[in-house]
A protein has these predicted regions:
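Small-residue (G/A/S/T)-rich helix-start motifs and N-terminal tracts that mark the onset
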Residues: 1-116, 123-140, 145-194
């Protein structure tokens, strides 16, 4: 895509990444790198406090806010982060801890820009679909076949047998776009024929 000559990092897209528990800093770093490599102008990472030093050593151009496991969420900072973003990615390496779930619920309830849900966000949603209730954002689910099977409460074999059908069922069930990742990627949107 051609960029406008008058553009700058602020006009090329600002993406908020909610990723990385204390044990999964690499997920936050890799996701933020992918955001920048895809052409976004700015990335801000919301990650667990223990990831501060590794994140800034690996990706000094990233901005960041931090949360601490088993402590109250920094809600004011999160609201500012969500208002700043043009898109939000949630889930890589987030974990399924109580605090991670609270972070995901808060994000879903307060996001109005496109919301990409991946990895542990999908695992949390598979356990409690009510997480998405009241979501006003356009949702994009990006499950691999195992995550898709969990979202649909079925088997991996069933999802592999019906690639388009399983993606379509997830899109309908969660009122979202579903990008099923496997050897062949299948995309399905709610309300559209597969």
């Amino acid at each position: 895509l051609t960029r406008t000559p008058m553009g700058n990092k602020g006009t090329f897209g600002k993406v908020l990444v909610l990723a990385g528990s204390g044990a999964m800093c690499g997920a936050a770093v890799l996701c933020a790198r992918a955001v920048l490599a895809s052409g976004a102008g700015m990335v801000k990472v919301v990650t667990e406090e223990r990831n501060r030093t590794p994140l800034f050593c690996a990706l000094p151009e990233a901005m960041a806010d931090f949360w601490k496991e088993d402590e109250p969420l920094p809600e004011e900072a999160l609201l500012q982060d969500l208002a700043w973003a043009d898109a939000v990615v949630a889930g890589p390496g987030l974990s399924k801890s109580r605090t991670a779930k609270e972070l995901l619920v808060f994000t879903v309830q307060h996001t109005e820009v496109p919301l990409v849900l991946d990895a542990d966000a999908l695992n949390l949603i598979a356990e409690d679909a009510e997480i998405l209730s009241g979501c006003r954002a356009e949702k994009i689910l990006t499950p691999h076949v195992g995550e898709l099977a969990r979202l649909l409460h079925t088997t991996i074999a069933e999802c592999q047998r019906e690639p388009a059908g399983s993606a379509g069922r997830a899109a309908e069930k969660y009122q979202a776009c579903c990008v099923r990742k496997d050897s062949v990627t299948v995309t399905a949107e709610e309300g559209r024929e597969q």
